[in-house]
Structures are given as C-alpha cells and as structure tokens.
Amino acid sequence: MKKILHTILFLLPLMAIAQTNFYVYKTDGTVETYAVSDVEKISFTAPEGPEEPVVTSKILTFEDSDAKFSKYTLDYCGVDVEKWSDLIPAADEQAYGASALIYDMVNSSAEYHWSDENNTGLSHTFPYNWGGYSFSGGGMVISNMTTTDEAMLQDTDIYNHQLSILNNSGANGSSNFAIVYNDSQVNPEVKNTLSFADGNAHTIKSMYVCIPAITLYCMINGNDFSQAYDDDDFLKLVATGTKADGRESVVEILLAEGDKYSTWAIDWTKWDLSSLGEVVSVSFHMEEAQIDDYGYAQYYKTPLYFAFDDVEVQ
C-alpha cells in the first residue's frame, strides 16, 4: 500500500563544533529544535494515505444459484422467468420452430430477452430479423444440453440438437451456458449483442467459448449447402466493442483452422477480451472461408453457432 508523506523533513546540523542542535524545518512553516542527544526521538513515520481503489470482477455464469434479477414474464409465451433455467427450451424442442420459447415471437413486438441484473449488468434481446424476433434470425439462448457422445457428430438428425455442445458441462463445470446463432449473411446489419443495462462503459475481461455440436457436424461432414472443412478452411469469432463515444474496437479468436479436428475449439476455451477497453456493448459475428454469392447478398455456407459462458466484467 502506498504511503503519502505529508511532512517533508529537512535535518540541518550546524557545522560548528560548539553547536549541538538539529533544526527540523516542517512544511507548515514551523521549526522545531532538537539536541543532538535527542535525535533518536525524531519520528519519520508517515501517516497512511487513502487506499487505492480495489478493482473487483463479476462473472455472468447463467447458473440458477447466481441469478439476482427480478422476476419477469415473456408475454408472447406466458413464461415466468425467475431463474436462468426458466429461459432454457425443453430438450425435445431444439429443432427449428419447435420451441414456443424461442420461436413464437415471429411477427410480434415481443422478444426473448434476459439481463444479468444486480451482477454484471449484461443484457441481451433477440435482434429483429426476417420480419420478427426468432432464434432463426439470430440470438443468444440459454441452454444446458451437453453430451460427450461423439456419435452425435454423425447423426443426420443433428438439426434437432442445435442447442447442444460436445462437452460434459458448461465452462468450469457449470450447468448452464448460452448458445448463439449467427445470421449467415456476410457483413449482416443484424448483430448478436451484449449490452450493459445501465448504459455505462465497463471492461469485459474474458469469456469462455466453444463450437456447438451442430456446427461441428457440418464442419466434419458438410451438408446440403456446405462442404466438410479441409486445409483451406477456418472458423473465426469476432467481437466488436462500442465505446461511450461511439468508437469501436475489435478482437477475434480463431476457433478452427484446417481439417484437424483435434485442434478445433471443441472444449471450452478462454477468450481474452480486455483489449476492447471500456465498452457499453459488444457485438459478435462469425466468419469462415466458404461463401455463396447470390448476387444480392453473400452467405456463409456452414450453419454458424457458438457457445459462451463465464463472462468476466470489471
């Protein structure tokens, strides 16, 4: 701890042999006199200054035990949300359009949304896309669906598992995490965004990310639109932070490169986001090498999803 010396002491001994005093000149303008024999009585102990501010971190975990937000209702489906797991679709409703929780707000003014109130302050609302609010247009959905059975990566029914990851848990052994669907259009206007509900700028230090099962399946096997990954392929996740004055900062992470499955970010991988600086929001998009050009727009071929968990905020 730093100590600030409020009184600077100057000790000036008189040089003449006959002089036996020390004079202490204090910063308040006074002078104190001490005999040489009493010099040990002079105290140089500085008073303690103010403590440096302690920088603390808070973590968005999506765990029910860490839920501090107020109860609210998703009006379009009548679901009361008191804890994070209330935002998780049923395990048998992962297919496109199957869950009223993440699909029934199409052509509606209501939307799936959540906020880490009274903790990190991070919040998310489904973006408006394709005429409404729906996970098929992008969004961040809470999930707890995990498997360690790699047979899923050969299951042609993979589209019924779009909220699953090939792990035995969330990051750091947790139960819940978020799955994000990235609109496949290249340079889309629609963004998957985390915002601070208080409107102030904060530093997002890091988060954990991994590639969900549905994207892994298509990277390994291809589908009707994409090819299996080869040496020239890559999968990248990009974060764009927006500062209070509107300036942007960017950081990215390479989730996969080439066809070496063992090197891909299948396990939870810590991503350092501190270089974004203090931001009021951060948006995410994904990029890959495989692109279809339809003239009016370009689209990535592979269904692009990512999972994230344990977001650390200062």
Predicted regions and their residues:
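Bacterial Sec-dependent N-terminal signal peptides
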Residues: 1-23
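Short N-terminal segments immediately surrounding and downstream of signal-peptide cleavage
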Residues: 20-35, 62-66
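N-terminal targeting signals for Sec/Tat export/insertion, comprising classic cleavable signal peptides
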Residues: 26-48, 73-82
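Low-complexity, Pro/Thr/Ser/Gly/Ala-rich linker/spacer regions in secreted
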Residues: 41-58, 314
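N-terminal targeting leaders for non-cytosolic proteins
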Residues: 53-189, 199
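Terminal, low-complexity interaction segments
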Residues: 60, 64, 232-314
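Extended extracellular/luminal ectodomain segments enriched in beta-structured repeat modules
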Residues: 199-206, 278-279
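Short coil-to-beta strand junction motifs in C2/discoidin
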Residues: 218-237
